Structures are given as structure tokens and as C-alpha cells.
């Protein structure tokens, strides 16, 4: 389907599938309740964006929360726009549409940036000879920063924290550990991160930036934490 030929159609919920490795959480929170109430009152104003799969189902590019809300209030079908997208195009589109949300946790943004970064790199690697791309001189990180409103350095930091163990990431998301110290701790091996987590739980505190930098250096020097 070409973009100019797009139209809204209704698809059964049972034929919709979540995006593979979707980095954005769908939570049954107060915002979800508000969304459900809005759908009850006005219907789904913005159609979901989906792409066709070979088995006759559709993968959601944008609209995971709307699908969840529609299921909860008993909808059988939802309005969608069907787009034929290659895998990497779908990743970029999914990330871009979800980054527009007001409330995004650090871990959601981190994994979204990582997925987009890897997709852009793959697309660039497959570029055919003779094709003109005005962004060829820019790094993938810089492109993401320009499009998403973060500096290239900040994009790199977000991607780096995807190397944290889940329990560490939870502390970043809930605000109990600062983002910048977390970036430094992401350089630790997984075993060291678990030991660090145990120490944090025992002391009931999280490291400052200066402490995290010292811990990172100890790890790099091969010394026991």
C-alpha cells in the first residue's frame, strides 16, 4: 500500500499482534483508565498503525495502549491504517510514534533508542551503490539526537544503560538511582552489577556520580568491588 492510498479499515482485535521486542510498557494505570473512559465516550479517534504479516495477522506499529484499552472495554474491532513496511522501517516508525508520548521511562527511551540505532545502521549497511542520501555524512547517533531532541552524547548514554541488569534499570525508572551514576555502573560486568545491587540493598542507598566513577575504575582495573 502506498501512503497516498491509505485508508482506515476495521480489524478484529484477535488478528492484531504486538510489535516484537516492543520497548514501551503498557500499564493498567490511571492514564489507561482515562484512555478507556475517552474511548467509551468518543471512540478511538486515532486509528492504530499496523503492518501485514504473512500469517494473515497484523503487527502493531503504533497503538498498543489503544488496543489494550479497547480489549478492556469489550471492543471486538478497532480502526487501523495498514502500511507495508520492511522490518527496519517498522522499527523506526514504531519508535518515533511512541517517543511522542508524554510519559516515557528512562529504560523505555533507552531500548527504543537502541532499536532505532541498530535499525538505521542496518539500513545504511544495505544501501545500494549510486543511491543518494543526504544523511550519509552523519552518524546514526547524531540522526537520532536531531530527530528526538537529545544530544548525541545523551543518546549514547541512554543506549549504554540497556546493559544494566533489570533490577538496576528499575531503580533508574523509579528515581531511586540517578541517571548519570547508572551510566557509569553500566560499564560493570553483570556479576559485578549484581554484587553492587546487593550492596545497595544492604546500605539502603545508591551511589553518587563520584562513587560510581570510582567503582567503574575498580572494575576496569580488575579489582574486587
Predicted features along the sequence, with ranges:
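Intrinsically disordered, low-complexity regions enriched in polar/acidic and amide residues
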Residues: 1-3, 130, 153, 210
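Short, charged/polar connector segments at secondary-structure boundaries
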Residues: 1-83, 89-103
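Amphipathic alpha-helical extensions and coiled-coil-like segments
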Residues: 12, 150-225
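Amphipathic, charge-rich alpha-helical segments that serve as recognition/docking helices
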Residues: 24-25, 32-33, 67-163, 170-173, ...
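A structural signal for alpha-helix termini and helix-coil/disorder junctions
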Residues: 41, 101, 119-123, 202, ...
Amino acid at each position: 500500500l502506498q501512503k497516498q492510498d491509505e485508508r482506515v479499515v476495521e480489524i478484529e482485535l484477535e488478528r492484531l499482534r504486538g510489535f516484537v521486542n516492543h520497548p514501551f510498557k503498557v500499564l493498567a494505570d490511571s492514564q489507561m483508565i482515562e484512555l478507556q473512559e475517552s474511548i467509551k465516550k468518543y471512540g478511538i479517534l486515532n486509528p492504530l498503525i499496523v503492518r501485514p504479516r504473512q500469517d494473515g495477522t497484523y503487527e502493531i506499529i503504533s497503538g498498543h495502549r489503544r488496543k489494550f484499552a479497547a480489549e478492556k472495554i469489550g471492543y471486538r474491532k478497532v480502526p487501523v491504517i495498514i502500511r507495508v513496511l520492511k522490518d527496519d522501517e517498522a522499527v523506526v516508525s514504531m519508535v518515533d510514534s511512541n517517543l511522542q508520548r508524554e510519559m516515557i521511562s528512562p529504560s523505555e527511551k533507552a531500548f527504543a533508542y537502541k532499536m532505532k540505532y541498530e535499525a538505521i545502521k542496518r539500513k545504511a549497511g544495505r544501501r545500494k551503490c549510486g543511491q543518494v542520501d543526504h544523511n550519509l555524512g552523519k552518524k546514526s547517533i547524531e540522526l537520532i539526537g536531531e530527530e528526538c531532541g537529545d544530544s548525541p552524547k545523551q543518546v549514547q548514554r541512554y543506549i549504554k544503560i540497556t546493559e544494566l541488569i533489570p533490577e538496576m534499570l528499575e531503580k533508574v525508572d523509579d528515581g531511586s538511582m540517578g541517571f548519570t551514576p547508572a551510566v557509569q555502573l553500566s560499564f560493570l560486568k553483570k556479576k559485578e552489577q549484581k554484587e553492587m545491587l546487593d550492596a545497595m540493598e544492604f546500605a539502603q542507598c545508591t551511589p553518587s556520580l563520584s562513587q560510581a566513577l570510582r567503582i567503574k575504575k575498580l572494575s576496569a582495573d580488575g579489582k574486587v568491588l
